[in-house]
UniProtKB/Swiss-Prot annotation:
Residues 23-42 form a propeptide. The lineage of its organism: Eukaryota, Metazoa, Chordata, Craniata, Vertebrata. The keyword Ribosomal protein does not apply. Belongs to the frog skin active peptide (FSAP) family. Dermaseptin subfamily. GO terms for cellular component: extracellular region. It is found in: Secreted. InterPro entries: Dermaseptin_dom (IPR022731), Frog_antimicrobial_propeptide (IPR004275), FSAP (IPR016322). Pfam families: DD_K, FSAP_sig_propep. The keyword Signal applies. Keywords: Amphibian defense peptide, Antibiotic, Antimicrobial, Cleavage on pair of basic residues, Secreted, Signal. GO terms for biological process: defense response to bacterium. Residues 1-22 form the signal peptide. This is Dermaseptin-DA2. Expressed by the skin glands. It comes from Agalychnis dacnicolor (Giant Mexican leaf frog).
């Protein structure tokens, strides 16, 4: 009976150790994923800002070109 208790205790102990190692690993992976998500959000925000500025400049250039063409046709 004592042998069974010791064996059961050993199995439970090893299971808990294994579980805690897995939990630490999972936490590390979650932290890495969170860092990757934050970096991708920052990149996305930079691209969004850049595209807005490029769109604004391109829109102004097209508007000026159309205005110039309209003015030339009126003369």
């Amino acid at each position: 009976m004592a042998l069974v208790k010791k064996s059961l205790f050993l199995v439970l102990f090893l299971g808990l150790v294994s579980l805690s190692i897995c939990e630490e690993k999972r936490e590390n992976e979650d932290e890495e994923e969170q860092e990757d998500d934050e970096q991708s959000e920052e990149k996305r925000a930079l691209w969004k800002t850049l595209l807005k500025k490029v769109g604004k400049v391109a829109g102004k250039a097209v508007l000026n070109a159309v205005t110039n063409m309209a003015n030339q046709n009126e003369q």
